[in-house]
Amino acid sequence: MKKKIALLAGLGLVQSVVLAQTKPTDSVTTLKDVVITSTKNNQKQSQTGKVATILGPEVLDKSYGKTLPQLLAEQAGITVTGATSNYAANKSVFFRGAGSAYAIILVDGIVQNDPSGNGGAFDLRLLPIDQIERIEILRGGQSTIYGSDAIGGVINIITKKGAKQPLNVYGVASAGSYETYKGTIGLQGTVSNFDYNISYTHVKSDGISEAANPVGNSTAFDKDGLKTDGVNAKFGFKFSDNFSINPFVRYNTGTYNYDDGPFADAANFSILKNIAVGTNAVYLLGNGKVTLNYSHQKTSNDVNSAYPALLEGQVNFLDVYYNQQLGKKLDLLLGVDHRDMKLPSAAGSPKTNIFAGYGSLFLHDLSVFNLEVGGRYNKHEQYGENWTYTITPSINLVKQVKLFGNISTGFKIPTLTMLFGTFGANLNLKPEKSENYEAGVEFNFADGKYTLRGAAYKRNLTDAIIYNYPQGYENQVSQKTKGFEIEPAVKLGIFSLNGFYSYTEGDEYNFVDNGVADYLFRRPKHTYGATAGLQATKDLFVSVNYRYVGGRTDGDFNSYPAAVVNLPSYKLLNAYAEYSLAKSRVKLFVDTQNILDEKYNEIYGYNSLGFNVNAGVRFNIH
């Protein structure tokens, strides 16, 4: 560890010696001057050493035929298990091989968490794509800024706010395969110093059978559909040039049908309800700024199966931070956050809290040199105190070439479900800790028309928590992961091409092998993909997406002890077309998925979607 820190310090020395002597595409935006708000000090793409991907309106406006998990699964370094399975199925995000419990989901910069869920992860099925303005993806450890869970990466989902006009009526209506229907209607606008965005979304799908039908079984399995309703309301009050408050309310409810397990049909269903209320407030102080984020989140999951249960989770989150420009080349960030978590439905209504103070110094535009150094102090009610840090340098060797690196530490506290839940709870669990290393290079030529980014990473996770059947949750010795990503992109007038290749390997304990295995469970070593887009005419846009997912190792849990199963690789070919009418106020779209009708299983014993189509119209009237 000391050698690696010394190596990074040596890189900083080289930078000092040198001192002494993201591009638009129709798939991903990586202009060098794009501001990344998830860093909390608004770093530019050209300044930061973090590996960031920005999905802007040019991507999201052409993704209305997809779900959010499907869109995220097309990005480098991210695997979303269940993204192309039945719509009602659970979705799990793997960030560079780290499970969904190690990824932080933000909505408008506010941490989303469900203490009653698997690993405390937020349910991505709750967010409709048509309410999203922008997505910022930060890969690698981010625990210094976002605390527990931010070991694999951060996804910041920025929702739409009021339109410039006093009144704008917008909506989406679509229909597709598996009797899938979606409708959104909304109002947005700005009147004087007040802006608003209010919407209602309804989704219904008959879906497919979640469980695969075993070979030789002549009985047809029933379909496992879903029906969801959601209301989103976001407001902005600008009281002066220096002070604004932005409250929000989100309410989602849905009924999700599911089966008993792999190859096992059942008439199970769960009724999920989620409400989030809170506010953002910003006060400008000369060259400084104070930001406050508060939210109250409550989730309930009424499980109806052979083992009925009511699972409830509650979180109160408060984050206050201060930015100050210390001259033109140095920025200061100081903040505190406090989180209260509770399981109201569990015996004794267990709860816990964690307090943190954090800060960073960001030195930028010092000739070719940029450097961010940060630290975080954490105090947990049960586990006491600990510290994390991050060191992130970058060097712009020439205008077209940037070197970057990162060393950071992270931690994750056991969730309340792990400590007090119904299945396998263990009060003797220890927090998980990680060490993260990253280095890479980025090329940018012809004013962003040609870009190439490559990054290699390594993560060591100690005391990783696993569910070891039948004992329950327990700490394993370690989990080690390493890999690299390559992301080329071309933008030539009306044509764009973006691609990626990701390699991930590691070893971890799993209870299928009942020991440490030299593979990562359900995570492929190799994934690659490409998206080509063409603005064929002023009104017609078309694109094609190809994605390859390598072989994975899973488990057959219908046998005891569970047996190791190898899942073959698969490839997906998708296409999208959009035509604008009435000065782009009306747009017709068609989204086709799995054109080759590939037969595959993301998870052993569960079905995946075959060839499917979603077509519809979206409109803006003002």
Residue ranges: model-predicted function:
Residues 5-10, 14, 20, 188, ...:
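Conserved C-terminal beta-signal and adjacent last beta-strands/turns
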Residues 68-71, 91-94, 103-106, 122-125, ...:
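N-terminal periplasmic accessory domains that precede
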Residues 69, 73-111:
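Extracytoplasmic beta-strand/coil segments of soluble accessory domains associated
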Residues 111-139:
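Short acidic/polar hinge/loop motifs at secondary-structure boundaries
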Residues 156, 164-166, 172, 189-270:
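Periplasmic-side early beta-strands and strand-to-turn transitions of outer-membrane beta-barrels
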Residues 263-280, 284, 396, 400-402, ...:
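Outer-membrane beta-barrel signature, preferentially recognizing the C-terminal barrel domain
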Residues 365-367, 458-460, 475-557, 596, ...:
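Gram-negative outer-membrane beta-barrel transporters
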